[in-house]
Amino acid sequence: MPRPASHLAPMPSDHPDFRSKSARLRCQPPRTNNCGTFKQPPSVAATSRPKPGNPFLQPPTKGTPPPKKKKKNHTEGCHTHEANPEPNTKHTETESPKPQTSTQHHTPITIPSSLLSQNTQREKRGLPLLTSRPSTIPANTYQPQSPHIHSHTPLQRPISTALLHQNLHIRARNIRHTGRLHGSPTKGAQTAQQAQPHPPKQLATL
């Protein structure tokens, strides 16, 4: 709805809307209740004096400070957090301890009572203690029994006597061959070489 053009005209100083709020309140007649006593307007009564029940609007007294509002604790009613949690730490109540991989495959080691009694006597004498396991292997290490542990070592196979004699003959022939290259061989070596023909190579059956 368009406003009337009268609001653009200058407002006279005696107009009721031109005066301040305090001047308008002063111009109002005093209100009286049924008994005839003086009663302030509600706007003046609300701003002049604070209510007695609100402690924040009252001026602070010298003896006791105004009561402060108690802050609600964050941890009240919360079952997942501690009262004073440490910074940068995770909650470990629900986490189960991880089993160690080194002790998964072993049962607890039981030492017989005879070894214990012998160890106490050896400890008094200053001798090393006796253990039920060899001292080179640690107690908590798991060593799988696989055939590929010692793969770098050559396999020890039984060698037949025929193959052993053949290997010795090949070595002796190599020695004679190197001696022939560096110098003339002796007559004994030549006669021995002519008398013994080279036997055919035979593979030993395992």
UniProtKB/Swiss-Prot annotation:
Residues 74-96 have a biased composition (Basic and acidic residues). Residues 1-153, 179-206 are annotated as: Disordered. Residues 97-120, 132-148 have a biased composition (Polar residues). Belongs to the UPF0328 family. This is UPF0328 protein ECU01_0050/ECU01_1560. It comes from Encephalitozoon cuniculi (strain GB-M1) (Microsporidian parasite). The lineage of its organism: Eukaryota, Fungi, Fungi incertae sedis, Microsporidia, Unikaryonidae.
